[in-house]
């Protein structure tokens, strides 16, 4: 469940900005039908920053309910205050959630020792498997391989989503962790190379609109069929890149709407709808991938 193509799911909203239960069900059904390994609910792509704490928990639990055991659900529970991250994570103890994705603290930029103590404290307050999340381009904080190696010794810290796009990190981390520690790419454009170097899968934005393609690519990579996997990846490469032509999740929400997966591409401020220029770029990438 923690390998292959794991989707960083968008949070669908109606025109008033309320979470749409019907569209959420449609998205989940789409991923069940198309081979996605698991869903991350309310991560960055799911607009965790603009949901209230109550909404955050409610969306995760709604996702779990609508998934109905058909696909594993991972909860995004990161925060830049350790006590808040613990509280968010503990909400899902004994809920049926299979694990939590916890991002490095953002804005306050802790030291490596601060990062270690932060994730250690979360792990001590839950039995849920924990996936570390390193995305310095968003957080301003880079968790180094040595810190990952220390954290990997804690029993319920079982994986990392490594989103630097720096492929040398695969080698560096693998040298410091046990063979059963899971390495997940957080960068769609380099995910196949990441897997070829020993990674186990990807937590994907692209999978929101190309679920079958991403699932097939990851399956082929796991089987060592990299030529076949690369053929899929080449079709998707413009999409991997152009889904970030404007800040995530602006482009991917519009793409979901363009494919009829959601009714609107509504976001909450300070996120604003995609520009005409951005829309044209994403549309061309969808067409290149054979999705539109």
UniProtKB/Swiss-Prot annotation:
Q: What is its EC number?
A: 4.3.3.7
Does Amino-acid biosynthesis show up as a keyword for this record? Answer: yes
**Where, in this chain's numbering, is pyruvate bound?**
45, 203
* Catalysed reaction equations from the record: L-aspartate 4-semialdehyde + pyruvate = (2S,4S)-4-hydroxy-2,3,4,5-tetrahydrodipicolinate + H2O + H(+)
- GO CC terms: cytosol
Active site residues of this protein? 133 (proton donor/acceptor), 161 (schiff-base intermediate with substrate)
Cellular compartment(s): Cytoplasm
The record places the site described as Part of a proton relay during catalysis at 44, 107
Any transmembrane segments, and where?
none
Assigned keywords, A-Z? Amino-acid biosynthesis, Cytoplasm, Diaminopimelate biosynthesis, Lyase, Lysine biosynthesis, Schiff base
Q: In the UniProt record, does the keyword RNA-binding occur?
A: no
Q: Where is it mostly found?
A: cytoplasm
Q: What class of enzyme is it?
A: lyase
Pfam families membership: DHDPS (PF00701)
Q: Which GO terms describe its biological process?
A: diaminopimelate biosynthetic process; lysine biosynthetic process via diaminopimelate
Disulfide bond sites: none
Record Gene3D superfamilies: Aldolase class I
GO MF annotations, alphabetized: 4-hydroxy-tetrahydrodipicolinate synthase activity
InterPro entries from the entry? Aldolase_TIM, DapA, DapA-like, Schiff_base-form_aldolases_AS, Schiff_base-form_aldolases_CS
Role played: Catalyzes the condensation of (S)-aspartate-beta-semialdehyde [(S)-ASA] and pyruvate to 4-hydroxy-tetrahydrodipicolinate (HTPA).
Q: Which family does it belong to?
A: Belongs to the DapA family.
Indicate the quaternary assembly: Homotetramer; dimer of dimers.
What is the recorded name of this protein?
Answer: 4-hydroxy-tetrahydrodipicolinate synthase
Q: Which organism is it from?
A: Salmonella typhimurium (strain LT2 / SGSC1412 / ATCC 700720)
């Amino acid at each position: 469940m923690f390998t292959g193509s794991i989707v960083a799911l968008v949070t669908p909203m109606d025109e008033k900005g309320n979470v749409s239960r019907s569209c959420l069900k449609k998205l989940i059904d789409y991923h069940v039908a198309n081979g996605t390994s698991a869903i991350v609910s309310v991560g960055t792509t799911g607009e965790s920053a603009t949901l209230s704490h109550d909404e955050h928990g409610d969306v995760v639990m709604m996702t779990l309910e609508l998934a109905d055991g058909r696909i594993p659900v991972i909860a995004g529970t990161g925060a830049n205050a350790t006590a808040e991250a613990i509280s968010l994570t503990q909400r899902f103890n004994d809920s049926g959630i299979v694990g939590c994705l916890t991002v490095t603290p953002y804005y306050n930029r802790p030291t490596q020792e601060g990062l270690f103590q932060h994730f250690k404290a979360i792990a001590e307050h839950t039995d849920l498997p924990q996936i570390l999340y390193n995305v310095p381009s968003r957080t301003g904080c880079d968790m180094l391989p040595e810190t990952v190696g220390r954290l990997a010794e804690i029993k319920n810290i079982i994986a990392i989503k490594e989103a630097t796009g720096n492929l040398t990190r695969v080698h560096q981390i693998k040298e410091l962790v046990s063979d059963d520690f899971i390495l997940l790419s957080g960068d769609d454009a380099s995910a196949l190379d990441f897997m070829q170097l020993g990674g186990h899968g990807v937590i994907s934005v692209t999978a929101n609109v190309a679920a079958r393609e991403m699932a097939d690519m990851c399956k082929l990579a796991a089987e060592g069929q990299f030529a076949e996997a690369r053929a899929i990846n080449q079709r998707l490469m413009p999409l991997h890149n152009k889904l970030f032509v404007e800040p995530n999740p602006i482009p991917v929400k519009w793409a979901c709407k363009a494919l009829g997966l959601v009714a609107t591409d509504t976001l909450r401020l300070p996120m604003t709808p995609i520009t005409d220029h951005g829309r044209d770029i994403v549309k061309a990438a969808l067409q290149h991938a054979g999705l539109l």
